[in-house]
Amino acid sequence: MHANVYIPEEFLTHIESIMPSHLDMASFVASCQKPLRKSIRVNTLKISVEDFLVRAKEKGWELEPVPWCETGFWITADESEAPLGNTAEHMSGLFYIQEASSMMPPSALFQGEADYQAVLDTAAAPGSKTTQIAALMNNRGVLVANEYAASRVKVLHANIERCGVRNAALSNFDGRVFGGWLPEQFDAVLLDAPCSGEGTIRKDADAMKNWTYQSVVDIADTQKDLIESAFHALKPNGVLVYSTCTLSTEENQQVCHHLKETFGDAVEFESLESLFDNAKATTTEEGFLHIFPQVYDSEGFFVARIRKLASVTPPEVKKRLGKFPFEKASKKAQQEVAEQLLGALDIELPSDTQVWIRDKDVWLFPEALEPMIGEFRFSRMGIKIAETHKKGYRWQHQVATTLATGNEANIVDLSIEDAREWFMGRDVRPEGLSGEGEVLVKYNGAIIGLGKWVGNRVKNGLPRELVRDKNLF
């Protein structure tokens, strides 16, 4: 597949100068010319690994565990009839197609830690690591998912929506703003930094077309600014994971050492040599993971885990925020929403959430977001659960996909034919059934959306960004 991969001589000379002595250039080049193995991560917000393995076996998928992620697997599957992304399991949010190496930074962030209340993902799109973090948080606390490129926020939101994430707040800023705007607000920060992408050759034969050593030096300056900002945003005793999909020490070890030189004893490097079996094979003397592609048959990657041992003085910023357009619901109003939701769909509001109102829209925010409200501008927070109208509430899609358990009384089960129609955005007519009002829609054990009975027809409530129109399961 990638035998014709472009690898500049200058790049090979550079890699040879930084490659550990026990590795060789011939195996590096050979691995760069091999296509990546396809990998997926089970989304435990929707299904347990055990139940997913049963499904995979039924479908004839062969899975091999990814050693650094309990929910990750390399997959061999027949995609001749429908690609993995168009299977019902994928569209239902049961799994995420994610490169195995990219599962490592969230695993490192949560190593030995279970109870983060506020987490920042500084460069979040398209959402593989964000949704992995949300699953590790079990949808509790608040997860701020930031993406600098406005064009990528839409796909980030679509993936968060598909995977049933309800504790996220999305923002669209340069990651360098967080240290000044939200100093010492987060228990954990993931900085998967923009980089020269030297480790991505195996999935992009032209990844090195524009590579120069000067571009490495230039982007390292940006990375140093980003890691300082991320460190400022971290609470004392909080954990920062810095990662890249590149190999140059200028963008990796040197960026981490810059942080240590800047903040001294407040910075502690924590070793990742026990993160998984054979992690020692890529562990540096500082305890970082510097992964060349031939070692684990993966992308090239770098991961560092850093603890903040003491408070540091944040940069001063002048904030100019407009009026916050939401109003927190009164206890009485929140209780009314909860009662109506329980009556209509047999769904309970989680105890760690708050109802907020914007005009006629009803939103559910993570309770842990409240300290940041008024301090920062988010592009989207929590989930929209309803629109108010004369007769009460019109419930929204994410109520079904993020709050329903699948054991509710008000459910319609679809056949495979009707499920295909549903994912194509069409209304369905379940055989021999009729009803009234809103109804949870289920296929093969998974809640896939919210519909409304109109006689014997269920009106489709699938958001446009989740509709697929061809080549389905």
Swiss-Prot record:
Organism in which the protein naturally occurs: Vibrio atlanticus (strain LGP32)
Function as written in the Swiss-Prot or TrEMBL entry: Specifically methylates the cytosine at position 1407 (m5C1407) of 16S rRNA.
Family: Belongs to the class I-like SAM-binding methyltransferase superfamily. RsmB/NOP family.
Protein name as catalogued: Ribosomal RNA small subunit methyltransferase F
EC primary class: transferase
GO cellular component, one term: cytoplasm
Xref: PROSITE patterns: NOL1_NOP2_SUN, SAM_MT_RSMB_NOP
Entry's Gene Ontology molecular function annotations: RNA binding; rRNA (cytosine-C5-)-methyltransferase activity
Reaction(s) this enzyme catalyzes, per UniProt: cytidine(1407) in 16S rRNA + S-adenosyl-L-methionine = 5-methylcytidine(1407) in 16S rRNA + S-adenosyl-L-homocysteine + H(+)
Any one GO BP annotation for this protein: rRNA base methylation
Family matches, as SUPFAM superfamilies: S-adenosyl-L-methionine-dependent methyltransferases
Keywords per UniProt: Cytoplasm, Methyltransferase, RNA-binding, rRNA processing, S-adenosyl-L-methionine, Transferase
Location of the protein in the cell: Cytoplasm
Active site: 245
Coiled coil: none
